[in-house]
């Protein structure tokens, strides 16, 4: 039993590292290739590793808006989830929400009723659902990324987004040939402002005369800006048209539209433009850095 809880403790660290805030040392994260998602009414269970632990701990990861394939925070959390299963022989289940995430609480309850030892809600939008569901399951550990919740059995995982974004800004300032770069945020609210401000500071640290274009896909209470590739492409094309040659995003699945725009502009003009993502991916080949 002690080994079971030790593994759970280590898994918290894996998830923290995967989401970019586990330590002060820079680390490269690799987004896992897209795989088919499970149906909500019959979640799949991943087999334990080759050397299973007696009474292996179980983890349930509930993704948020955009789900797998967003090339952003959902894919990154999923990579940490897979590593926990592979390295520690855990039994794992992952679920994806409805389009707007309205069923977050239902999915958390589904994980709890299945008896999972650790349940992770991926994103600050789980705070309300955590407050409602977690008190009914005091013996189960819950965690929420980028947020906090009141119940004593819920742990919030908060990160220094501005620091990583500062480095992205430095890189953009060093790479640009037009002295014009862009930023796309998913939703115009404080959490994403951390990414924006870090990026702006990084650019200014290299060259304060560089123009930085700012665009957001939506404003609260509309959180669709985290999964609107069409809007992301529209904003990116406008920024490229206005002279940007590098764009950095913190917009979840909306950012995939930015990658499409980068590819289109590069192929149409013969001039290389870049779409930049905080988390590494090869999904758009040379158009992501």
Locations of regions flagged by a protein language model:
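Bacterial lipoprotein signal-peptidase II cleavage site
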Residues: 20-28
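Extracytoplasmic "Venus flytrap"
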Residues: 59-85, 93-104, 124, 188-193
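An alpha-beta-alpha
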Residues: 81, 166-214
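Flexible loop/hinge segments that line or gate small-molecule binding clefts
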Residues: 135-159, 281
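Hydrophobic alpha-helical segments within soluble ligand-binding/sensing domains
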Residues: 157-179, 232, 289
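Extracellular/periplasmic Venus flytrap/periplasmic-binding protein
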Residues: 198-243
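Single conserved hydrophobic/aromatic residue that forms the stacking wall/gate
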Residues: 279-288
